[in-house]
Every structure is written in C-alpha cells, then in structure tokens.
C-alpha cells in the first residue's frame, strides 16, 4: 500500500514497509509534448476528467477517490485525489498506458517477485509482484489517526509480552484465557524471565488495516514475529514515485528513508556494542517466499545477509563465520519465524536457525529483532481481548479499533457468534499443526464479522526445500 508515510522518528513499526534502485533515461517520465485524444485543455479539467473516468465504488464500500460511502459520496474527487489528477495533467492521462508498461518493465528488471509456497516445495513457480499504477493516497489527518492507533497497539503488545513472560498478572486477573497463551505454540517457555533490552520486544510489527464504509480504519490482523514488507514498500515507492514525479512533489508525500535510519539506529542503541555493533539480517534462504526483499533490505541498510549456517553460538555469544575467522555479532534483524530460530530449544528439525541462539539472547549478548515469543499475539482469537488489556495495562482506550471478533473457546462468545456466522469469516485460533493434534493445546476458532483473512508470514517451506535439496 502506498500513501503518505510518516517521519521515521515517529514511524509505527508496522507501517514502515516496502525498493531496488534502477535508474534509466526515462525514469522520471516527464510530460513530453504529444498529440492526444485526451486534450482536456487545462490542469483543472484534468481533475474533472479523472472524476468522470473513475467508476464509483460498489454499494456498501468506501469510495477512496471521492472520500465517502459509495451511496453517499458526491461525483467530485476527494481533495487529495483532485490534487493528484491536477498534477498529472492532460498529457499524463494520455501517457498512462506507457507508464503502466514502464511499471511492469521495472518490476521485471529489478527481479521483483513473490515466491509462493509451491516453488519452495519444488514446483518452480514464481508469482510476479502485484503493484497498482495509481497509489493509495492517505490524507494527513487519516494518517495521523493511523499513526496514533498503531503506536498505541505496539506499546500494548510490548506491555503484554513483558507481563506474560514475567509476573503474568494478566493471567492471574483473568484478562486473557490461559488456553490462548500457554496453549498456543507461539508462547515460548524458554523466554520466561527474559528481559527485553530497553523494554522493547517488538522493533518491527505489521498490521493489516481495512477501511469500512463509514471511512474508519479497522485492524484485521497483526504480525509480530518477522513481518515481511519493509523491502517491498521501498521498491513500490521508488517505482511509483518515478512514474509520477510531479504529483509526488506537488503532494509533498513524506519520505521513507528516515524510518529505516531510525530502525537501524534503535537497534544499534539497544545492542551490546552500541554504535560499534555488527548487525546482520537473518534469512531462511533463497527458497523463502520473500527472499527478494531480504536481499534488498540487507543491501539498503548496509547489513550482512546471513543464513543460519553462517552463524555460530559459543559461550553465550553469536559469531559470524568469515575467511578471517569468527567475528562477533551484536544484533540480528531476523526474517525467520520463532520456532525455527534454535534447534536446541525450539524445533529440533530446524535447519534455518542457530544452535544456542536462545541462550545468547537471554544472556543479553545479542539483540534479536524481534525477540522470540510473540507468535501468540498473531492469533485472531486474541483481538477481542485487547481493548480491556489496553485499559488494564495502559489505562487507555484503543483508538484504532479492530473488526468485531469472538473467540469461540468461550461458550458465551460462541453463543453470540453462531447467529452471525453467515456474515463473518471463521479463522483458526491456532496454527494448522495444533489443529491436527500437534504441540500445544486449547481449541476453538476465532470469528470475524466481515473483512478478509490476513495471512501471517510463514516460511517453514524453506526448511523443507533445503532438506529435499
């Protein structure tokens, strides 16, 4: 999703997401003089022409172009979109086909793709990355509300993790059913008693948001382990901004670079060696679905891209294997989910992690972003309990609401949800391995009233592919 991005010093970790540099002579696609059937006569006419061309949203949906519910919105464009089409001008309309071709060409040249699970399993398929020509424009007031809500939810997640791996007052007070926490495989007992550097469990998080017919944003899902998107966001922004340079300048779209600097600086500040820290990016490998962005993000941030076999843990410290010998590692930005991080304490069949990594993390000798143990927060069953947790832990009301959801492991919630079944989406509370009788416990499903399921970023297929290869 492209839109107005916030300054990096205030950037919510979830929305600092998605670049590859590709400079060519036509990158800026300035408005060349040309004969066109779309000669609207003036810049203002271009905005009216855009409004006439754009089909209205489906009834019951929010009309982004016109800024209102489909049945209630006027025929005119929302101010931000009017400004965009005005900057585009009449020649810009005539040039849209060429810009669309340029977008596809740049994605191919930059290798921008998503590798679906079947490729990792040996199918060889590569899914082209999907990117719309026109960006989603989020007005400053809307973005400020999203920013406040996301930052608040990150603070809440940090407070929940600190409590559940510490004093566990949440469970003692009955604010969360134990089955949703200790029964979930994402709750890692090896992290009990661990201290998060600076109180920060989550350095990066991702939130799936949707806008309702009333224009309000709602949370659909949250991703807390090693969420994907930071590299794709940058690539999307670079490509689209070069296709519409005048519009991006005219709308004063906020920059992204400061957000990435802030992420790196915060990791340096919290890692053992501070500014002299060596930070690496841990990837499952080239079979991972989002390996493209792992490689790009490491290059953009100036980090060494490593796999589990490139690291070793000795004496509660982590080292990088080099031709010059072992070199200390002080920070790890990971793109490997929790269960695969350490075969000694987590999944014994993992080939993606580092034996002894968990011990080094608990000893405080290496910063792991994000800290392991937040997987249970990704369960859709927990969403309905977050408002009262915010009141209990932060003494605040959540400003960014989630879709209405019920955890059907409680009889009262199940009775309330069943009559609404035809209008909602049923999601599993626990991963498939637990549903099939694997490790973990508890049961029940989570039901959402409306929306689309948000798929958590999982990459165990890389381990299967590596074992097969």
Describe each model-derived feature in a short phrase.
Residues 2-7, 15-469:
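Preference for protein termini
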């Amino acid at each position: 999703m492209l839109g107005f991005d916030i300054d990096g010093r205030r950037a919510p970790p979830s929305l600092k997401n998605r670049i590859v540099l590709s400079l060519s002579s036509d990158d800026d696609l300035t408005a060349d003089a040309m004969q066109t059937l779309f000669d609207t006569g003036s810049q203002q006419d271009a905005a009216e022409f855009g409004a006439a061309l754009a089909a209205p949203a489906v009834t019951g949906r929010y009309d982004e172009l016109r800024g209102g519910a489909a049945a209630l919105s006027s025929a005119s464009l929302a101010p931000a979109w009017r400004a965009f089409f005005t900057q585009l001008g009449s020649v810009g309309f005539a040039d849209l086909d060429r810009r669309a071709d340029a977008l596809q060409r740049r994605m191919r040249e930059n290798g921008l793709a998503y590798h679906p699970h079947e490729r990792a399993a040996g199918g060889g398929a590569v899914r082209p990355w999907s990117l719309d020509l026109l960006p989603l424009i989020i007005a400053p007031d809307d973005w400020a509300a999203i920013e406040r809500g996301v930052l608040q939810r990150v603070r809440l997640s940090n407070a929940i993790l600190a409590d559940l791996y510490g004093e566990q007052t949440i469970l003692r007070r009955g604010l969360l059913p134990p089955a949703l926490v200790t029964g979930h495989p994402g709750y890692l007992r090896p992290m009990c008693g661990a201290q998060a550097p600076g109180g920060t469990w989550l350095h990066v998080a991702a939130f799936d948001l949707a806008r309702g017919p009333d224009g309000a944003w709602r949370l659909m899902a949250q991703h807390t382990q090693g969420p994907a998107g930071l590299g794709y966001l940058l690539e999307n922004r670079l490509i689209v901004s070069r296709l519409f340079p005048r519009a991006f300048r005219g709308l004063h779209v906020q920059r992204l670079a400061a957000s990435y600097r802030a992420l790196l600086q915060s990791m340096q500040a919290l890692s053992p060696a501070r500014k002299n820290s060596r930070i690496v990016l841990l990837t499952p490998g080239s079979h991972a679905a989002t390996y493209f962005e792992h490689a790009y993000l490491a290059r953009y941030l100036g980090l060494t891209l490593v796999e589990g076999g490139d690291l070793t843990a000795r004496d509660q410290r982590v080292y990088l294997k080099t031709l010059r010998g072992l070199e200390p590692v002080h920070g790890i930005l990971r793109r490997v989910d929790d269960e695969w991080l350490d075969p000694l304490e987590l999944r014994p069949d993992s080939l993606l992690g580092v034996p002894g990594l968990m011990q080094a993390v608990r000893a405080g000798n290496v910063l792991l972003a994000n800290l392991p143990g937040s997987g249970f927060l990704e369960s859709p069953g927990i969403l309905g309990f977050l408002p009262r947790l915010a009141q209990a832990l932060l003494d605040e009301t959540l400003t960014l609401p989630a879709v209405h959801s019920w955890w059907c492991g409680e009889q009262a919630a199940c009775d309330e949800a069943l009559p609404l079944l035809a209008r909602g989406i049923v999601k599993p509370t626990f991963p498939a391995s637990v549903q099939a009788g694997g490790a973990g416990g508890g049961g029940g499903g989570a039901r959402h009233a409306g929306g689309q399921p948000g798929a958590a970023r999982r990459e165990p297929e890389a381990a299967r592919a590596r074992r097969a290869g």
